[in-house]
From Swiss-Prot:
Name under which the protein is recorded: NADH-ubiquinone oxidoreductase chain 2
EC number(s) given by UniProt: 7.1.1.2
Topology relative to the membrane: Multi-pass membrane protein
Residues annotated as transmembrane: 11-31, 38-58, 74-94, 106-126, 129-149, 161-181, 210-230, 238-258, 270-290, 298-318, 330-350, 375-395, 411-433, 463-483
Reaction(s) the record says it catalyses: a ubiquinone + NADH + 5 H(+)(in) = a ubiquinol + NAD(+) + 4 H(+)(out)
Keyword Protease: no
GO (cellular component) term, any one: mitochondrial inner membrane
Organism: Dictyostelium citrinum (Slime mold)
Family of the protein in this entry: Belongs to the complex I subunit 2 family.
GO molecular function: NADH dehydrogenase (ubiquinone) activity
Keyword vocabulary terms for this entry: Electron transport, Membrane, Mitochondrion, Mitochondrion inner membrane, NAD, Respiratory chain, Translocase, Transmembrane, Transmembrane helix, Transport, Ubiquinone
Function: Core subunit of the mitochondrial membrane respiratory chain NADH dehydrogenase (Complex I) that is believed to belong to the minimal assembly required for catalysis. Complex I functions in the transfer of electrons from NADH to the respiratory chain. The immediate electron acceptor for the enzyme is believed to be ubiquinone.
Location (main, coarse): mitochondrion
Signal peptide: none
């Protein structure tokens, strides 16, 4: 009887992903009116995400399912909550765009693809088998290729094709690494590989396979020098889709790398892996900082900023994955997600141009201080937070990430990261100068007038809650870090 009940519960857990997808497809076919169809699908998708979060919350802390192919820990549950929360906010922003008739409108096919990518990413985080990891990553990647392809824009088509080509190369490298490990060990399960790797720490085929898998994941993440395609993809995909791709890719890739490190990499020649990773991190920090300093388009600046933040997030892998580094990195990731969410809410729901378009170029921020001082102050606070200026919370989270490397003896890495952070701050301060000081001259052509709204139903709540976190969360820093530490200790 107990076994029957467990099987029934497992069927419910597995079907919670598939049944909503079938329902969404049926709704997209059966409802004829476009606006009504998209609205119903959005509401169904929001409800589905809430149900999935509830199911994840009532699951056991640590358990294995599907005969060891998937595993769930408290850290994985935290990352899944972050993924579902970000996805819910993205769907909400798309809903606001559909309601107001903005350029952020999305089709029913796009919503189904977003949900399909969420399924793939959830499975990727829980994957405890290399072939399961590969297939789940491909599910989300195929959806990303189509979502990034904006057929109404030349840059969107170009970026989508680049994403597809680079994604294919990354997939090939990833699959080659899996084949190399399977040829050497005869298994794809993490538990089996763990025993074999501990007995054969110097097997070059295992080391090469792990290196290829990590390289494929880094290529998908856009770490320098494999970053050029990422900028064009984000510019063509649009602001909201850039937000979705930026956050979700970081969450999934970081969780997959953590799983790989704890189950495989830590028992191999970790020194070689660490040295190679440090070189990539240093190159990424330099390229991301220099690239962001010369950007005039807001979305390209966000893309370069995302590259820098990716380097800071994978720093914990170069620090032997100590508990302190993991806790601080997760805290930094949460701060980054909240800061970027507030920035996107400002751009999409609070700041817009009078022609009902969204802000795309930096110069369009001119006169904001004159038009609406309150909106300008909020925008400046968010920019200062993302720049990591004291006393903002993001400054503390950066300090928490970098200082442990002083103890580990990697002073050069810490000092270079601090130096490059100052370079990024200079650009953020230039944005503040544009908002407060610069004024639109009468002879400038093509400068649309900025309109600032303060409707609480259009992103206002997200902005208020986000700004409160940016300013006041440091008052409860010890409590927040202790909660994260408990979660990390349970993996």
């Amino acid at each position: 009887m107990v076994c029957l009940f467990e099987n029934l519960m497992n069927m419910i857990k597995y079907s919670i992903y598939i049944l909503p997808l079938i329902i969404l497809i049926v709704l997209s076919i059966s409802i004829k009116k476009d606006v009504q169809r998209v609205h119903i699908i959005i509401q169904s998708l929001k409800l589905t995400l809430i149900v999935i979060m509830i199911v994840i919350g009532i699951e056991e802390s640590i358990y294995v399912k599907l005969n060891g192919h998937l595993i769930k820990t408290e850290l994985i549950k935290l990352f899944e909550y972050l993924l579902l929360g970000v996805s819910y906010m993205i769907i909400k922003m798309f809903e606001e765009g559909v309601t107001e008739g903005k350029k952020t409108k999305i089709t029913d096919e796009g919503l189904i693809l977003i949900y399909s990518s969420i399924i793939g990413m959830l499975i990727s985080m829980e994957a405890h088998n290399l072939i399961t990891l590969f297939l789940s990553l491909e599910i989300s990647s195929i959806c990303f290729y189509i979502l990034a392809l904006n057929k109404n824009s030349r840059k969107g088509i170009e970026g989508g094709l680049k994403y597809y080509i680079i994604g294919g190369i990354a997939t090939t490298i990833l699959l080659l690494g899996i084949v190399s490990i399977y040829k050497s060990t005869g298994s794809l399960m993490y538990t089996d590989l763990l025993v074999i790797v501990m007995e054969n720490t110097d097997d070059y085929r295992i080391q090469m396979g792990i290196a290829l898998i990590v390289l494929g994941l880094i290529l998908k993440l856009g770490i320098a020098p494999f970053h050029g395609w990422l900028i064009d993809v984000y510019e063509g995909a649009g602001m909201l889709m850039t937000f979705y791709l930026t956050i979700t890719q970081k969450l999934v890739t970081l969780m997959v790398l953590i799983n790989l490190y704890q189950n495989l990499i830590i028992y191999t020649n970790a020194i070689m892996f660490t040295n190679g990773l440090i070189i990539l991190i240093l190159v990424t920090l330099v390229v991301g900082t220099i690239g962001s300093l010369r950007q005039q388009k807001l979305i390209r600046f966000i893309a370069y900023s995302a590259i820098v933040n990716s380097a800071l997030l994978i720093l914990m892998l170069a620090g032997s994955m100590s508990e302190e580094l993991m806790v601080n990195s997760v805290y930094y990731l949460i701060n980054y997600i909240i800061g970027l969410t507030v920035l996107m809410s400002l751009i999409m729901g609070f700041l817009r141009l009078n022609d009902r378009g969204t802000i795309e170029d930096i110069y369009q921020l001119k006169n904001m201080w004159v038009i609406n001082m309150f909106g300008a102050i909020v925008y400046i606070l968010v920019l200062m937070y993302l720049a990591g200026l004291p006393p903002m919370t993001n400054f503390i989270s950066k300090i928490l990430i970098l200082l442990p490397y002083m103890v580990l003896g990697r002073v050069y890495l810490t000092m270079l990261a601090f130096f490059l952070s100052v370079g990024v701050m200079i650009y953020y301060m230039n944005l503040v100068k544009i908002i407060i000081i610069d004024k639109v001259q009468t002879h400038e052509q093509g400068v649309a007038e900025l309109e600032i709204t303060s409707k609480p139903t259009k992103g206002g709540r997200r902005i208020v809650l986000g700004v409160m976190w940016l300013i006041f969360s440091q008052l409860y820093l010890d409590e927040i870090l202790n909660v994260i530490k408990v979660i990390v200790a349970l993996i």
